[in-house]
Amino acid sequence: IGFIGGIIEEKIKSFGFKPISNLTGHKITTGLLHAGIDVPNIKTDDPYEFREGEIYAIEPFATTGSGFVSDIDQVEIFSLYSFNTVKMRQSRQILNQIISERGLLPFSERWLNKKFPSRLTISVALKEMLREQIIRAYPVLKDSGDGLVSQTEHTILITDKGNEVLTK
């Protein structure tokens, strides 16, 4: 995998940009978007080799800035962390919707706004779920050097002949 990161890094640099070193692609398994194996955007010494049948999101991140991102105080993406319950009835309705439609996959407050008309109810429910550690919050990321960031993604299946691009 470290070799693949080197190829991604070279390609990004050939266009005059910097790869973002602390963001990666990742292995995907059924119901689990980030399955524990990262695909770097820079060359590393990681000796792991792709195996037939595995699925990966290859996600080159490029920037005009520093090549490193950090969190800002804004959250737009969440994911289910535990199957505990909440006290408020509206929070339970929202939690049940998340479980039935998203499971462990990430979701956004914007997605909930399409399902539930009250932004205040959604905000209170999300705060309750965060406090009870039922969901995780993912802060928005920003280039540390204030550069512009781009990202693209292809999902690939590793086959006996190489790979098959699943996103087209």
What residue spans do the PLM features occupy?
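Active-site neighborhoods and metal-handling regions in enzymes and metal-associated proteins
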Residues: I1-K168
